[in-house]
Amino acid sequence: MTDKSDRTDWVALMRAIRDHRDEAAFAELFQHFAPKVKGFLMKSGSVASQAEECAQDVMATVWQKAHLFDPSRASVATWIFTIARNRRIDGLRKDRQPEPEDLFWGPDSEPDQADVYEMQQENARLGRAIARLPEAQRALIERAFFGDLTHRELAAETGLPLGTIKSRIRLALDRLRQHMS
């Protein structure tokens, strides 16, 4: 005695779904494969509710992507179970992703007055150190960091070679580091 699934032409059903959006063919395919996909997912570690949801998602994908099924490359069962396996892997990857930390949304708290004072003192020291740089270095530092110009833009603006711009900025940063320490 043969089972009905042995006599069913799954490829013909897939063609009917693909070519005619045949809902009856899809219902027959769904009745046969959805429980098997759910069982496959449960055997691979999913809880029943997740397996049910994933099986529904897999069968919806079968309906939506029926045009991608190629009987010369795989059987209907292989194609459907490959979709199920890939969804299972996607679910595992999603579960492994760390949750972002709870972010506080709202106005920032007021900075500590000691921190504000310290930052003001540091800014004043930096201003004095920049003022002590040679004019050529100071001008480049100000335009690069406060004027938001790239080294290439500075070279084009001043007519100096790019290497000279980089050297002067590096030397200026070295001097600032010495003055600030």
Swiss-Prot record:
Region Sigma-70 factor domain-4, as annotated, extends over: 129-178
Domain free text: The sigma-70 factor domain-2 mediates sequence-specific interaction with the -10 element in promoter DNA, and plays an important role in melting the double-stranded DNA and the formation of the transcription bubble. The sigma-70 factor domain-2 mediates interaction with the RNA polymerase subunits RpoB and RpoC. The sigma-70 factor domain-4 contains a helix-turn-helix (H-T-H) motif that mediates interaction with the -35 element in promoter DNA. The domain also mediates interaction with the RNA polymerase subunit RpoA. Interactions between Sigma-70 factor domain-4 and anti-sigma factors prevents interaction of sigma factors with the RNA polymerase catalytic core.
Q: What is this protein called?
A: ECF RNA polymerase sigma factor RpoE
- Assembly and interactions? Interacts transiently with the RNA polymerase catalytic core formed by RpoA, RpoB, RpoC and RpoZ (2 alpha, 1 beta, 1 beta' and 1 omega subunit) to form the RNA polymerase holoenzyme that can initiate transcription. Forms a 1:1 complex (via sigma-70 factor domain 4) with anti-sigma factor ChrR; this inhibits the interaction of RpoE with the RNA polymerase catalytic core.
The annotated consequence of gene deletion is: For single rpoE mutant increased sensitivity to singlet oxygen when carotenoid levels are low. For double rpoE-chrR deletion mutant no effect on anaerobic photosynthetic growth. In illuminated aerobically growing cells single and double deletion is bacteriostatic.
**SUPFAM superfamilies, alphabetically?**
Sigma2 domain of RNA polymerase sigma factors, Sigma3 and sigma4 domains of RNA polymerase sigma factors
Q: DNA binding happens at which residues? A: 151-170
Name the PANTHER family on file.
RNA POLYMERASE ECF-TYPE SIGMA FACTO (PTHR43133), RNA POLYMERASE SIGMA FACTOR SIGZ (PTHR43133:SF62)
Among the GO molecular function terms of this UniProt record, one is:
sigma factor activity
Answer whether the UniProt record assigns the keyword Oxidoreductase to this protein. no
The record's comment on protein family reads:
Belongs to the sigma-70 factor family. ECF subfamily.
- Interaction with polymerase core subunit RpoC, short sequence motif: residues: 53-56
Q: Which UniProt keywords apply?
A: DNA-binding, Sigma factor, Transcription, Transcription regulation
Role, per record? Sigma factors are initiation factors that promote the attachment of RNA polymerase to specific initiation sites and are then released. Extracytoplasmic function (ECF) sigma factors are held in an inactive form by a cognate anti-sigma factor until released. Sigma-E controls a transcriptional response to singlet oxygen, a by-product of photosynthesis; its continuous activity requires constant exposure to singlet oxygen. The regulon has about 180 genes that protect against or repair damage induced by singlet oxygen, including itself and rpoH2, a heat shock-responsive sigma factor.
- Source superkingdom: Bacteria
Q: Which GO terms describe its biological process?
A: DNA-templated transcription initiation
